[in-house]
């Protein structure tokens, strides 16, 4: 399963770490994924993985069970 936000589609970013000598090493910035139970418009409940930022938005919209 891909490390991807189920609602927004966000995934990890890639880039380089730079030391003091400016040596480049590839690295990834992963999402802070959380499992959460969500209720849709029909009232059915299901589990999805969302990022912490999306989780804050869902809590604000009161969509979390």
Swiss-Prot record:
Keywords noted in UniProt: Ribonucleoprotein, Ribosomal protein
GO cellular component, one term: ribosome
Family matches, as Gene3D superfamilies: Ribosomal protein L28/L24 (2.30.170.40)
GO BP field: translation
Residue span of region Disordered: 1-26
Domain of life: Bacteria
GO molecular function: structural constituent of ribosome
TM helices/strands, residue ranges: none
Biased composition (Polar residues): 11-22
InterPro entries (UniProt xref): Bacterial_rp_bL28, Ribosomal_bL28, Ribosomal_bL28/bL31-like_sf, Ribosomal_bL28_bact-type, Ribosomal_bL28_sf
This protein's record includes keyword Glycoprotein: no
Family named by the database record: Belongs to the bacterial ribosomal protein bL28 family.
The name this protein goes by in its record: Large ribosomal subunit protein bL28
Organism, scientific name: Mycoplasma mycoides subsp. mycoides SC (strain CCUG 32753 / NCTC 10114 / PG1)
Organism lineage string: Bacteria, Bacillati, Mycoplasmatota, Mollicutes, Mycoplasmataceae
Chain's gene name: rpmB
């Amino acid at each position: 399963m891909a490390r991807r936000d189920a609602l927004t589609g966000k995934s990890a970013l890639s880039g380089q770490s730079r030391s003091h000598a400016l040596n480049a090493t590839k690295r990834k910035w992963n999402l802070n994924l959380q499992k959460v139970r969500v209720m849709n418009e029909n009232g059915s409940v299901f589990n999805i993985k969302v990022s912490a930022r999306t989780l804050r938005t869902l809590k604000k919209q009161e969509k979390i069970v």
